[in-house]
């Protein structure tokens, strides 16, 4: 039986967090935070199933690169207690396999984030043993990304 779990958090400098670090963790990657010079390396983390960045059609193409997107967010927010991103962690039903997980998340993100002009970075984790705790991390902008004006 599927177990419902949804957790929401705010990634804030005031609590010592970084959007770049959160993105590196969820994507099991290594990203340099240009704001504070810290290299966040989660390449040894296991269980990454899928990752994708969803952007509104008018968002800059270079935001498809995770490091560029989240460093732009860090650069844009200037104060020591800036709210940088919203983070969602949602349990995925073990009864389904990877393809329906991707489809469910893609539909949800397009309807709830992209349609409202927000970027969202998503990753599915299925840690060892596989099927034990499948879940998705969604990192979204706090502020709606505005279309570029000519």
What are these regions (language model features)?
Residues 146-150:
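Short "domain-exit" segments at the C-terminal end of structured domains
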Residues 1-145:
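N-terminal nicking endonuclease/strand-transfer module with a His-rich metal-binding environment
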């Amino acid at each position: 039986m599927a177990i419902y779990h949804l957790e929401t958090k705010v990634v804030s400098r005031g609590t010592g967090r970084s959007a770049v670090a959160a993105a590196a963790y969820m994507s099991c990657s290594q990203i340099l935070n240009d704001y504070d010079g810290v290299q966040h390396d989660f390449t040894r983390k296991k269980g990454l199933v899928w990752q994708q960045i969803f952007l509104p059609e008018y968002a800059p193409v270079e935001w498809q690169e995770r490091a560029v997107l989240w460093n732009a967010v860090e650069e844009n927010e200037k104060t020591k207690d800036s709210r940088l991103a919203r983070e969602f962690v949602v349990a995925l039903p073990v009864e389904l396999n990877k393809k329906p997980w991707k489809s469910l998340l893609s539909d949800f993100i397009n309807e709830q984030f992209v349609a409202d002009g927000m970027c969202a970075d998503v990753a599915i984790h299925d840690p060892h043993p596989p099927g034990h705790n499948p879940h998705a991390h969604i990192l979204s902008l706090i502020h709606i990304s505005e279309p570029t004006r000519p």
